[in-house]
């Protein structure tokens, strides 16, 4: 009983979306083989899911359904519309990309797209909205009619050619009706068919021309079709009659126009924006305008030499009006999404439009069919689960017998072992933090896609011309290679996801504990730490020959000290602090050391930034540090200088002020003894650099001797 209630609730909800004439769900394209760079046919679709509460977060699986034998009486059932059909005694193997929620009584299968073992490929559907006047004459059959949720699982197991698939759909609609208006694509290595389901029992399908391309969203686009050309057209017998009976029959240039006779009177804003964007992206010189009353389905590029690649169609499905600066994607506007309840068809701000690469995409796919490959291969599907904005397209042959485990995960919420949830999370982070990631994530995938495209082309060349028998014999080796490759790519996805999570955590931690940066203007030395706000830094640049333990080596030495700004009291120790020191552009750094009170030097771990010409290390003490170079350099004796930098409490880019004064002490004496260790925060006498109140006895001694010598010199002068 509960399942029945849920099922009818879903039906009512779906109907409310359909009748609203505003459904932001799915965009499709076709490019004939005469217009592609490699002579392949390409078609595909983005499956959008704008429905609350998920709104673009709806897990999709990618699976292979093995060939099966059924007993008499076995029935295929659609949970959404109640469509049923007897299973055949034997049904073919096929792949599909279903919803994870299938089979729970509240959600249909929605297999989306796939190949079967005979090389038939299919994507279903781009939902289309029939005109209300037509629906009064030929209503949709929402109880028992054929609809999107079951189409893939009904057609692919039963047909051996694309035409057979169209004929099966047509026959079923004649007998049982259609639950929805739909656009469907079926292909094999010989031909591709484009089919529009126009109302409860009306439809027209055409064999797609090899020299045309098409872009279509959630409405109808077929113009005049020669309904008598049965070799290239499959149509319901009453398609003109129903339009006339509905008083919605339209002619253009004296010929029956299918789309204008079955469409709503005007394109929905979301349909117009996507189709216009797609046409102008693929054909920049087109004369089409945004306000055109009709967008023709069959198109030729204005430039007769224009040819399209995989990268072009990936860019099409990712497009966010980058080539149309007058528009912005409406998912940036923070407004109610069009299509949620049908009440927001016209955007409040006309700048914001519904994009092809929108936030609601849950599954994008590109099918590439090459007639050089055996039919058993089907072709290649480039699968882009999740939003297209920041997720990669990964290639799979139609001949595979299994898919990687991460594609089968059926979690309804984030699961780290799910391919869908991983890429969805990557897109979410990239989209919500464009200031952090920019286009870096997309560019990473595009670089990998270049490699995969080249690799796939090599594989296609190897398999071209194989007999069907030889091709079938390769199914398992190819599957094993595909599983291994999927594992490798999934680990790349997880690594990127982990890096992004860590980056955002670092930023969040920084906001909670903002790092203050002190920079000494005279030397360019800077230190960074969350707790420098009330401190000042004093830097003494030492004479080049002042550290005896480094005698004969080329180095720069600095005495870095901290004190409280309020009372000038020296600070002896601080938590881990990053110190950055500029280095000579013409020399290579050998090591970084600090000098302890005894004049001994100890090596530090450091990192180099060749572009900025700096080195950085982490310490919790402040004393004398030296950057030692590998090659001896000409040194000049300069006077030591001291500069003081006062801390400020803003972020890492804080500008500070410096006051330069003459030094009051000389550098520490240095011995010839050298030891090597890694700095730690543990305080050990004679090993860690002295700081603040731990005043160097050597420096005090040198100072006292200097004062005594000065006293006697002055006294001697007075006597003279």
Region annotations inferred by a language model:
Residues 334-465:
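Substrate-recognition/cap regions that form aromatic- and gly/pro-loop-enriched pockets
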Residues 628-691:
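C-terminal low-complexity, Ser/Thr- and acidic/Pro-rich disordered "stalk" regions positioned immediately N-terminal
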Residues 26-147, 168-308:
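A contiguous strand-loop segment
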Residues 442-511:
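Histidine-centered catalytic/metal-binding microenvironments
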Residues 512-515, 519-522, 544-598, 631-633:
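Proteolytic processing hotspots in large secreted/extracellular or virion-associated proteins
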Residues 568-573, 586-588, 595-636, 640:
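Proteolytic cleavage junctions
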Residues 705-720:
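C-terminal membrane-anchoring or membrane-association module
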Residues 689-702:
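Juxtamembrane/start-of-transmembrane alpha-helix segments at the extracytoplasmic/lumenal side
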């Amino acid at each position: 009983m509960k399942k029945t209630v849920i099922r009818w609730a879903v039906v009512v909800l779906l109907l409310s979306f359909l009748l609203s004439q505003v459904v932001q769900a799915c965009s499709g394209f076709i490019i004939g083989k005469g217009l592609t760079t490699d002579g392949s046919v390409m078609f595909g679709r983005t499956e959008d899911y704008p429905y609350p509460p998920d709104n673009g977060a709806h897990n999709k699986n990618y699976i292979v359904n093995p060939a099966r034998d059924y007993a008499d009486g076995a029935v295929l059932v659609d949970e959404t519309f109640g469509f049923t059909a007897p299973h055949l005694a034997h049904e073919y193997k096929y792949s599909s990309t279903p919803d994870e929620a299938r089979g729970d009584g509240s959600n249909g299968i929605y297999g989306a797209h796939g190949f079967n073992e005979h090389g038939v490929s299919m994507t279903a559907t781009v939902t289309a909205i029939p005109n209300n006047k037509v629906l009064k004459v030929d209503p949709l059959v929402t109880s028992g009619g054929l609809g999107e949720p079951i189409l893939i699982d009904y057609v692919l197991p039963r047909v051996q050619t694309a035409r057979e698939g169209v004929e099966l759909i047509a026959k079923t609609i004649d007998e049982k009706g259609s639950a929805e208006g739909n656009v469907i694509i079926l292909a094999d290595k010989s031909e591709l068919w484009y089919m529009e389901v126009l109302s409860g029992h009306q439809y027209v399908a055409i064999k797609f021309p090899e020299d045309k391309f098409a872009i279509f969203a959630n409405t109808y686009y077929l113009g005049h079709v020669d309904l008598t050309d049965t070799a290239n057209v499959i149509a319901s017998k009453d398609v003109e009659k129903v339009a006339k009976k509905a008083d919605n029959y339209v002619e253009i240039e004296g010929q029956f126009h299918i789309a204008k006779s079955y469409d709503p009177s005007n394109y929905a804003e979301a349909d117009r924006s996507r189709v216009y964007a797609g046409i102008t992206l693929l054909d920049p010189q087109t004369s089409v305008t945004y306000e055109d009353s009709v967008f023709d389905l069959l198109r030729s590029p204005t430039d007769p030499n224009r040819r399209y690649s995989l990268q072009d169609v990936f860019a099409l499905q990712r497009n966010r009006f980058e080539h149309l600066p007058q528009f912005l994607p409406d998912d940036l506007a923070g407004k109610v999404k069009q299509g949620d309840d049908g009440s927001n068809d016209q955007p409040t701000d006309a700048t914001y439009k519904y994009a092809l690469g929108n936030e609601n995409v849950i599954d994008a796919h590109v099918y590439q069919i090459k007639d050089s490959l055996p039919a058993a291969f089907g072709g290649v599907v480039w699968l882009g689960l999740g939003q297209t904005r920041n997720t990669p397209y990964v290639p799979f042959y139609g001949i595979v017998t299994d898919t990687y485990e991460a594609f089968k995960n059926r979690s309804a919420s984030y699961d780290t072992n799910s391919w869908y949830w991983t890429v969805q999370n990557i897109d979410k982070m990239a989209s919500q933090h464009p200031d952090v990631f920019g286009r870096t994530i997309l560019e990473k995938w595009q670089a990998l896609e270049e490699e995969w495209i080249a690799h796939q082309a090599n594989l296609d060349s190897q398999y071209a011309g194989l007999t069907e028998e030889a091709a079938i014999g390769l199914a398992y080796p190819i599957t094993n290679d595909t599983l291994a490759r999927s594992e490798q790519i999934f680990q790349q996805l997880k690594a990127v996801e982990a890096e992004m999570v860590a980056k955002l955590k670092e930023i969040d931690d920084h906001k909670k504990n903002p790092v203050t940066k002190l920079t000494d203007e005279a030397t360019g030395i800077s230190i960074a730490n969350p707790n420098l706000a009330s401190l000042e830094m004093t830097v003494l640049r030492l004479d080049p020959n002042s550290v005896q333990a480094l005698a004969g080596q080329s180095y720069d030495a600095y005495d870095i000290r901290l004190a409280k700004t309020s009372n000038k009291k020296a600070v002896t120790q601080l938590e881990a602090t990053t110190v950055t020191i500029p280095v000579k552009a013409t020399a290579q750094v050998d090591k970084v050391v600090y000098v302890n009170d005894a004049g001994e030097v100890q090596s530090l771990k450091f990192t180099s930034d060749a572009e900025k010409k700096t080195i950085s290390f982490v310490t919790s003490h402040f004393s004398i540090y030296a950057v030692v170079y590998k090659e001896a350099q000409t040194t000049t004796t300069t006077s030591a200088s001291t500069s003081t930098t006062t801390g400020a409490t803003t972020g890492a880019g804080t500008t500070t002020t410096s006051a330069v004064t003459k030094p009051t002490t000389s550098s520490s004496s240095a011995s010839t003894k050298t030891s090597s260790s890694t700095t730690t925060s543990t305080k050990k006498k004679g090993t860690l650099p002295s700081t603040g109140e731990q005043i160097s006895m050597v420096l005090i001694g040198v100072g006292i001797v200097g004062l005594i010598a000065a006293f006697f010199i002055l006294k001697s002068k007075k006597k003279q």
